[in-house]
Amino acid sequence: EESTAWPKVTGDVEDGGLGFSLKWNMGWMHDFTEYMKLDPYFRKDNHHMMTFAMSYAYSEDYILVLSHDEVVHLKCSMINKMPGLGFDKYANLKAGYAFMMGHAGKKLLFMGQDFAQLREWSEERELDWYLLEEPEHQAIQSWMRDLLHMYKKKQALYELDQSWEGFEWVNADDAYR
């Protein structure tokens, strides 16, 4: 985890880099979680929060991380960051995870996020596995399974995700559609 703009974290040592394989994309994580917290009505005015990371996505070899740091210390679980009630919260979470899978960079979800753990994570207790008896949590788990299977099957989603050649904007500024 490196949270500054230190250059060449994943650059070759021979070229002055640090030689790490991947760097956590902290900027993407912050913008993504803040955007997803917004009521959908207000998202169009904050569209840049979802597109800005692509302006630097290939400056390092990034991994998109929704880590334990985002679901502890009164920051809420991912599902409880979502606006709305009931169905809307789960629909927002599904949309967010789909966006993440389509974004350049490797992916990492922290435990419990794949079935919408309700409580914040704590090292003092296990995950709330009983939630998988509830249809909405089963649906999130199935959604994640299907997204991951699609990601694995569709090489275009990962094959060139560390190169500009693997991405093309259709319209980065179409916030009002």
Give the role of each language-model region.
Residues L131-G166:
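Aromatic- and carboxylate-lined catalytic core of secreted/periplasmic carbohydrate-active enzymes
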Residues W121-Y130:
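Active-site His/acidic residue clusters
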Residues M82-K89, Y130-Q138:
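Short, contiguous acidic/charged loop-to-helix segments that flank catalytic cores in large enzymes
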Residues E1-S122, K152-R177:
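Conserved alpha/beta catalytic core and glycan-binding cleft of carbohydrate-active enzymes
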